[in-house]
Amino acid sequence: MNAPQAPVLVADIGGTNARFALANPTLTSAPLLNDSMREFAVIEFPSLGEAAQHYLHHIGIHTTKGVFAIAGHVDGDEARITNHPWVITRTRTATMLGFDTLHLINDFVAQAMAISVLGPQDVIQIGSAKWEQFPLSAATRNYGIIGPGTGLGVGGLMIRNGRCYPLETEGGHVSFPPSTPEEIRILEILSQQFGRVSNERLISGPGIVNIHRALSEIDGIDPGPLRPQDITMRAADGDIRATRTINLFCNIFGTITGDLVLIQGAWDGVFLTGGLVPKLLNSIQHSGFRQRFEHKGRFSAIMARIPSLAVIHPHPGLLGAAAYARDTEQVPQEIKA
């Protein structure tokens, strides 16, 4: 009889919080083990290794394998978290934890890998185009993924005969394409501050503030210092300029999401993720998002058939790290101290 497979430690590490869970990567759905997720403030620990040690001690299980998704640049053996001073070295962290295998991946690689294990209960359809699921082992698919939060993450996932290949990009830094006279004026205003204006300057938390500030300047109003949540709260209370801001955000989001499909050839669907999507889901559903998504000239009829899905799974980063562990199980990356 074969011994049960040891779980893999998966982590989703951001600038504020570190989330950990145990996963069974052999499970094609729901690979995260029940009640294993814990969240800690990164400021409480001097290093990622010590945060992971704390988790393993707290949960009372030891493992020798890990996949850590990092919200920042991963360069070979080293990763740096955006907006936090941790510098993570893979070999040093693995040695500290007694791991045989440790992978560091970008957080949006994990978000993309999560697509392969999401179920109907984990997504909400935006528009009428339906998402058709197929057994992973037989699937050949191209998906896009886009996620506004502190910045704008963009990536993709190719599936070939059950094997997943995440596409890591910097698509959030593509130049912003205005589609209306009002958006052209907004671009002119933001250009005065930033010079070149990327999509991330509008489709992100700070982007909400930028759009609102530009609209205020057009209206000859000084809005004072505002945070993204201030603007979304004002929109919920019926403030006209804040409502215009959120509507514009959703419309522009639709345009650049459609552009992503065309650029990547993501003909099987695009997934919306990131911290802002659940908060703005109702606005996205009732805005011009889908109309702008489909409005691609000679490709409009094709775009109308492509599903767009908002991810509502609470921990897609952990889910994707587990999926990454599944696909790397046959080709382990050994750690040598």
From Swiss-Prot:
Superkingdom of origin: Bacteria
Pfam families listed in its UniProt record: Glucokinase
Catalytic activity, reaction form: D-glucose + ATP = D-glucose 6-phosphate + ADP + H(+)
InterPro entries: ATPase_NBD, Bacterial_glucokinase, Glucokinase
Key word Secreted present: no
First-listed, main subcellular location of the protein, grouped into a coarse class: cytoplasm
Keyword ATP-binding applies: yes
Subcellular localization(s) per the UniProt record: Cytoplasm
The protein's Enzyme Commission number: 2.7.1.2
Sorted UniProt keywords: ATP-binding, Cytoplasm, Glycolysis, Kinase, Nucleotide-binding, Transferase
Residues reported in the UniProt entry to bind ATP: 11-16
GO cellular component, one term: cytosol
GO function terms (MF aspect): ATP binding; D-glucose binding; glucokinase activity
GO biological process, one term: glycolytic process
Family statement: Belongs to the bacterial glucokinase family.
Name of the protein in its database record: Glucokinase
Source organism of this protein record: Xylella fastidiosa (strain Temecula1 / ATCC 700964)
